Amino acid sequence: MTAMMKAAVFVEPGRIELADKPIPDIGPNDALVRITTTTICGTDVHILKGEYPVAKGLTVGHEPVGIIEKLGSAVTGYREGQRVIAGAICPNFNSYAAQDGVASQDGSYLMASGQCGCHGYKATAGWRFGNMIDGTQAEYVLVPDAQANLTPIPDGLTDEQVLMCPDIMSTGFKGAENANIRIGHTVAVFAQGPIGLCATAGARLCGATTIIAIDGNDHRLEIARKMGADVVLNFRNCDVVDEVMKLTGGRGVDASIEALGTQATFEQSLRVLKPGGTLSSLGVYSSDLTIPLSAFAAGLGDHKINTALCPGGKERMRRLINVIESGRVDLGALVTHQYRLDDIVAAYDLFANQRDGVLKIAIKPH
């Protein structure tokens, strides 16, 4: 008789439901992880709304914290019963894309089925959980290429302390890294949701000495100060572009990080940049963008626009855990609510509608 588990699955736009699914069978390079904590991401809400397409019946979620239940025969250096995380991005690090430095765009595992070209590049395909394969909002998840993608959790850290590592922390910090921040730089971070807050923390670690955090929620701006923001601006109370230009003496910021994914925030991120500055884009956009010529100096302003998909792999996760363990960053304040997996539909309703001051929800299957 097939062993079954509970899982949150995409049914159709507007509907994610709890369903019974078979516990995954693993291959020699895989691991089966029993989920102890996972969470809901803004990207999951895009999936819920039908703004990002996935297959019907797919288990959603991409942020796993759990315990190794079973290891494939080729996976070494780990043990059953060990607490681990895996990145939201689980590439095959032998692929062209990974060796080219863009492991998040690795679609090499799709080549045999004809879904990817001969060199294995496919946009966003390195993001497998809840996108290309069944995800983490379930009692169990299959981790592919486990040797390269599992990272042990130190005994002294709780699930909640490392819950941001697989995606939100990795993405936010990548936004700061992509902003080309140098010691003494001034940085504006647009939107202080979970990713923006992590980008604010990452900008501080990268050496920025003046960080301007922008949002329309005063509570989130208070948290931004704890994450390292020196100045907070509520866009409901001021003209953000004017204020940033005043704060910089008309020079503009060295870098801006866009962490929402709207035309308005993208455009503002450009307008506050100094000539030669960098816009680091983290938002997931749902419609075409327009670049205003005046903000972009008609393409002649030496501006740089960098985009990124959350980096993954066990070494990335290890370094993020090191940051948490060092005490330099505490992301515990981002976990504002806890739900059982059985109540996942209610958790989505809360998160998608941004009620009750929600930032991140810890989902507990057991």
UniProtKB/Swiss-Prot annotation:
It is an enzyme of class 1 (oxidoreductase). It catalyses: a primary alcohol + NAD(+) = an aldehyde + NADH + H(+); a secondary alcohol + NAD(+) = a ketone + NADH + H(+); (R,R)-butane-2,3-diol + NAD(+) = (R)-acetoin + NADH + H(+); an aldehyde + NAD(+) + H2O = a carboxylate + NADH + 2 H(+). Its cofactor is Zn(2+). Keywords: Metal-binding, NAD, Oxidoreductase, Zinc. Zn(2+) binds at C41, H62, E63, D167. Disulfide bonds: none annotated. Its EC number is 1.1.1.1, 1.1.1.4, 1.2.1.3. The keyword Oxidoreductase applies. GO terms for molecular function: (R,R)-butanediol dehydrogenase activity; alcohol dehydrogenase (NAD+) activity; aldehyde dehydrogenase (NAD+) activity; zinc ion binding. Binds 1 zinc ion per subunit. PANTHER family: NADP-DEPENDENT ISOPROPANOL DEHYDROGENASE, ZINC-TYPE ALCOHOL DEHYDROGENASE-LIKE. Multifunctional alcohol dehydrogenase exhibiting NAD(+)-dependent dehydrogenase activities for 2,3-butanediol, ethanol and acetaldehyde, and reductase activities for acetoin (NADH-dependent), and diacetyl and acetaldehyde (independently of whether NADH or NADPH is the reductant). The rate of oxidation of 2,3-butanediol is much higher than for the oxidation of ethanol. Has acetaldehyde dehydrogenase activity leading to acetate formation. May function in the release of excess reducing power in the absence of exogenous hydrogen acceptors such as oxygen. Homotetramer. Belongs to the zinc-containing alcohol dehydrogenase family. This is Alcohol dehydrogenase. It comes from Cupriavidus necator (Alcaligenes eutrophus).
